[in-house]
Amino acid sequence: MFVGETQGAKQKVSGLRHNYNLKILYTIFLTRCTCYDKLNYGDIMVKIMFVCHGNICRSTMAEFVMKDIVKKNGMENDFIICSSATSTEEIGSDTHWGTKKILDEMGISYTKRQAVQLKKSDYEYYDFIIGMDSANMRNINRIIGYDKDNKIHKLLNFANMDRDVADPWYTRDFKTTYDDVLLGCTRLFDYINSYI
């Protein structure tokens, strides 16, 4: 399990020192997010929110890739994994067909969903809020405000890289985006798992 709230877990990631308050949080309510697979009342869970611009390409890809990773490790009951947008442009839209196609090719399951926007109150609920690029990070901080608990990070920082996960909405290269998402999610899982 994670260390208690009063015990900070410190780790150096991509040259930056992060002091995580890895809190023991209990699942006592549902939020408006539509991507929960299951919630077990009273169970201790790690809560991750992936964020991109529209919540139809990269963040939803990361959501399903991370769910696949934790499931393959027999830990699906230890995580709540969701995704959201910084913008309102695609609210209510399902996952982009290009993301579905690459997930199909990689044998990763996904469910029908609706894009939602990140909100300020998500900060108190989630342990990690993970952006895909520098623009996402600016917009996340604009929505959330002060990151007092060091919860907000860029995905590839966990792979000791400072670069962005490219938006396939523009590049149309969903395979390269998938490779970056898989790398980032794998390293994020390894990081979290080292404290469980």
Annotate each PLM feature.
Residues 20-44:
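Short, Lys/Arg-enriched N-terminal segments with co-localized hydrophobic residues
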Residues 52, 103, 130-131, 181:
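Hydrophobic structural packing positions in well-ordered secondary structure
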Residues 3-5, 9, 13, 37, ...:
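Acidic, Ala/Val/Gly-enriched low-complexity intrinsically disordered segments
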Residues 1-2, 10-17, 22, 28:
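Composition-driven detection of intrinsically disordered, low-complexity segments
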Residues 122, 128, 134-196:
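Phosphate-binding/catalytic loops
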Residues 36, 41-125, 190-196:
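Conserved active-site segments centered on acidic
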